[in-house]
From Swiss-Prot:
Protein name: Phenylalanine--tRNA ligase beta subunit, chloroplastic
Any one Gene Ontology cellular component term annotated for this protein: chloroplast
Reaction it catalyzes: tRNA(Phe) + L-phenylalanine + ATP = L-phenylalanyl-tRNA(Phe) + AMP + diphosphate + H(+)
Family annotation (PROSITE patterns): B5 (PS51483), FDX_ACB (PS51447)
Organism this protein belongs to: Porphyra purpurea (Red seaweed)
Amino acid sequence: MNFLNKSLIRDSVVLQNRWKIIMKVSLNWLKELAKIEIIDAHSLANKLTQAGFEVEDVEMVNIDGHKDYILDVTSTANRSDVLSMIGLSREVSALTQADIVKTADIPSAGLFDNISTIISDDSLLNCSYYVSAIMDNIVIQDSPKWLKNRLYSCGFISQNLIIDISNYIMLKWGQPINIIDLKKIADTNTESYIEITSNFCSSKQKSVKLDNKDIALSRDVLITQINNNITSIAGIGINQEFHVDQNTKLIFIEAAIFKEAVVRKSSRSIGIRTESSIRQERGLNIDNGRSAYRETLSLLIELTHGKVKATFLKKETENSTLNIDISLKKIQDVLGPIKDNHTVRFLSFDEIENTLKSLQFKITKKDVKKFNVIIPSYRKYDVFREIDIVEEIARVYGYNQFQSKIPKIQFTKHPSSRRNFIDQIRNILRNLGLTELVHYSLVKSKGEINLKNPLIKDYSTLRSSLLEGLINASAYNIKQSNQTVDGFEIGTVFNLKRNKIIETTKLAIILGGSLDIRSEWSEPAHSLNWYEAKGIIENFFRKLNKSIQWVKRESSNDQINFIQNNKSATLTYNNDNIGLFGELNELTSSQFGFNTELFVLEIDLDILQYSDPEINYLSYRIQPYSKYPCITRDLCIVIPKKMQINSLFQLLNQFNDNDLENMTLFDQYSNKLLGNGKKSIGLRFTYRSDHKTLTNLEIDNKQNELQKNIIKKLNLEIRK
């Protein structure tokens, strides 16, 4: 033989970190299984790539004077059926609309006549299919040239006739075949009783030799035994002690299909993946296993002149067929129109039927719109849903044959009142200069509702408040030497109430943290204070047309411990508690590294929207702007600490001066000189007339009258 490229040779053992297997596919062998004489290797590679396979290389080789092309093909993990030449030939015939060459019927006469034992299910654990035979009078000769060429083209080196036949069958049918030297097992021959079992390792069974390595066994490893001798690690490899050699005369042939999860667990436990284990892990087909076993015996009889003396068979489970109902409309809706001479049309039933039949799917038409699809047993691992059939049609027909334009959908449904309400809140807050923030619904801290099996410890609890995310985001910005952001978040929080999880939509706002607040350009910048932050919140509710009441907060009524008691308030709407507003306390600010005041708000949007079934609009006074200038006067008043500023403003408005345009608070402080329970506030009064310019004398008279009313009627002290 003239081997020109040694890169074809592959290792028999694949390392555990290999997640995929690359099949070396001989084009000449493929042409014998499917009628694709016309197509060339590169065109075939393109078709396979478009159908979801990876063709990593196409290489021309010369094997024994014959030119061949070798394709390195990788399939997805769920396509166990294409890990064989038979399976790949089915795929290629569907993609190229070629016929499959019917494999020659393998004679079964004499192969199964001497069934000596039916093996019980209890003896073979985790095994869905098992058949074996004993053959004697074996004469091991040199492998025929055609067999060596087949193996070499697929990356295998010829070892001896028995092993070559085993590898050839695995490449052709995808079914691993174990063949061992039965004479090397003590107390076994064709006449004596043979016990075949598969079970998990016991503590006494320490190791097995595979590929010149001692493999330590654990209780997770499934093994097969003959008369209590470990013959193989189930689905992975044969015990090297029982390998066949040139002197072998009596052999034991075994074809088995084990549960995928068990083989996968055994493979991970010992750290080895083989050609056999990869196929077992992905799932094998009983029909292919039966054909592979029969052809193995046929080749052994033909090439070694051996005779079958006994066979062993586990009662086979029936290959259940999968029936899937699907409608023509479903296929057309998912795939959309196809490209057909600039006209828009959809796949017809005949086109769909031909495509599915090329995949060996059986079609039964129920009516004009629906039909039933029977899935072949070798495709049960990847086609078991309606959408899988749609994907197969698109894959074989050609993804590029469908129009890629996304269809336009006409939405006739109007947004809900809920959606409009949330959008209105977003627009108002954005217009006020706030940035919308979004955080995960899962948080690190332990709360009422914890996940049983979280992927990450940092995200193991459903959040019960939005404030934690906003505070953490501000702290992260500071750590990155960035400024904090005045932001808001609208999201869902979760709480337990009477052992039921209650979902609530809330709004949270965070303000402050930066030194860039100034009322005039000439003033030095300062951080946001309580009154400015409260003014932003009041402005928000005013624009939202919601009349909110500010009530003194009772800290015992909530579990929030990071807000100052004397700088916080409970917000109510129609006498319903909707949330709170306040400044972070010093302990929290120091823990997170905040150097300036930060203010937070959290309210319940469900209560805010649905508290009153009737819409109560705020009353407005509409009047034209005055074209005359304003004049301001400042006044310091000593009031009780418990008096609320809003209450004072309402009392002052009772004096009914039409020229008094506005009152604002600009300062407050308290000390011992003022007396216990008292504080001094600075108020700025703005006067403006609608029909003339006010003089200083007129303003002074109005201000003096106001001071008299404050002293006499309100019994308050004016500080000079």
